Amino acid sequence: MQSDDRSVREGSDSSQTFLMKMAQPTGELTHPSQQQQQQLLQQQSFRSIFGGASDTAEEIDTETDSNHRRPHSFGAAATTPAKLANKNVAPFLVKHIPEQYGPLGSRRTDKLEDLSSPNSKFCYRHRPDLKCRRQADEPSMDKLQRELETLPPSDQQGIAHVWSLFSAAPAKHRKLILQGIMAQCCFPQLSFVSATVRDLIRIDFLTALPPEISFKILCYLDTTSLCKAAQVSSRWRALADDDVVWHRMCEQHIHRKCKKCGWGLPLLERKRLRESKREIELRATTWDVSGPAQNAGGAECSAPHADDVITQKRKADSSDDETAIVKRHCSSLDARPEPDEDYYTTRYRPWKEVYKDRFKVGTNWKYGRCSTKVFKGHTNGVMCLQFEDNILATGSYDATIKIWDTETGEELRTLRGHQSGIRCLQFDDTKLISGSMDRSLKVWNWRTGECISTYTGHRGGVIGLHFDATILASASVDKTVKIWNFEDKSTFLLRGHTDWVNAVRVDTTSRTVFSASDDCTVRLWDLDTKACLRTFHGHVGQVQQVVPLPREFEFEDHDAECDNDNMSTTSGDTESNSLQATLGLESNATETSVFGPSFDNGRPAPPRYIVTSALDSTIRLWETTTGRCLRTFFGHLEGVWALGADTLRIVSGAEDRMVKIWDPRTGKCERTFTGHSGPVTCIGLGDSRFATGSEDCEVRMYSFRN
């Protein structure tokens, strides 16, 4: 209890020692009348603040009047004010600050009694054990000191006594003193108090709060406010620039539309984004109060390098001078690894730098700022393409596949082997699969140009293919979809379309396949039961493309336009439309059950939204669970041959030689690109660029990175 009492008493302002010295008799007032007048003035001031017995006040007033009439009298009345001052002021100071003001032997030993008194409670700003206690402002105290020194010594002593009394008073007495002073202030003085208090009551709440709460507050700010917060102080900058805050910002905006601000940033590998979330949350609770921990959380606490779709890895590249300067080492800067170990050490960028990079790309997409590169080499129309990192693969009616370096524009190699025009292709890190009008599919080592194997089975030309993991689906002129299983070497056909099947998309998560056909329909197939789960009707022209949207895509139902479109219908082999309308979408179980009994046991549902294009010059956005057409995109003058989509935009190419970029949520055409002299037949879409192929034998790549 003694130590607690000592800590409470030490909670007074750091300038109290100076004030106490000023409160002691100065010794400079040697003339009795001057000393008497000063003490009388002090006593009058104190009693006007604290109040007192009326007889004492009358005695002081009488003596004051007597002194005014007899300024040089040194009678017994001259000693009375000094005694009264000592009687009323000194005991007050001794009671509340005995360590600094009380004479020897007069200090109280009963600490328990002092602490039990309600007057011993200090307000939170003067408790030394509280973090948010306001410290003395050194510049203000220096200014106060200089102004005080300009006054006569008698005035200095009187003012110092008032300060000493207030500094020594507990919370209850302080309020009374302030109320009395405020009651006597005029309007200019009250205005001065208001202006002064406005600044004094401000506290650094981010420093006072625990780090995890400070991060929670900062996560509610937008990017502009965060940057302004970082300019407040070094402490605020450490908090506002921390990975905890900017990881949340990336998670909220990258590859999706933010519901608050409407902004969405280009694609980032969301798997890595989700994997690092737990480490970021742990980092927030273990943040060092003296500043952010160096490389806390290791590799998982940093963002993957968002350079391109699918293969964005935030590994340092010596050729990337622009980003290398902001990358940081994951290991300690003091412990330098061996040269070989340093060579293989992964480097990372702060999440703020990742957001900054994505924001620049997103702004370029919004305003159409891009650079264009043209690839020429094919002797006939380009019908298919795909790009990853700096590799571009194109297939043409000249029966060749060309591999390009997107950075230099150089043709790396040409793959020859098909006997007719190539209508579709897809590649990954190890292989490239192509489909041709010669009814075959070929598997290539695109790095060497070697044809590894050839698959036949269709009775017509192969005009569409898509593989995911171990499943390959091919679409053919023979009106069928063929499924190839690389794992068990099995194959089977999906029959149901009545005309050419132009495009297929495999979803291995739900084990389903989408197909688009010249019979103006889109079908959803179950790979386990080989049954058609859903048929989408609505297009009045041959459907050329179908693209499932990522599962992160969100669409507000109130934005739907085609709810009452009688021409947009759906049919299923196991359910009726009325049953689909009756079943809600309130849970995942309900969402999967609309596709049949095979989805009742927790099997993942197919992608909820798909986008299709047709030769009726329109693009449609569908909801797979109900079969509704949510939105129709109008703008192309002729049939839409090519389509690409992600969570932020839809890119389409048509017979009218134009490429259009759409907002999938509003249906608005954001930008139109021209340049091809023939119909646009294929499109590849990435996070910061897209490529188009045309019957004019050219491929054009638009980059929004620079």
Swiss-Prot record:
It holds the Pfam family WD40. One of its GO terms (biological process) is protein ubiquitination. SMART domains: FBOX, WD40. Pathway: Protein modification; protein ubiquitination. It comes from the Eukaryota. Residues 1-43, 56-76 are annotated as: Disordered. Transmembrane segments: none annotated. Residues 203-249 form the F-box domain. Component of the SCF(sconB) E3 ubiquitin ligase complex. Belongs to the WD repeat MET30/SCONB/SCON-2 family. This is Probable E3 ubiquitin ligase complex SCF subunit sconB. It comes from Aspergillus flavus (strain ATCC 200026 / FGSC A1120 / IAM 13836 / NRRL 3357 / JCM 12722 / SRRC 167).
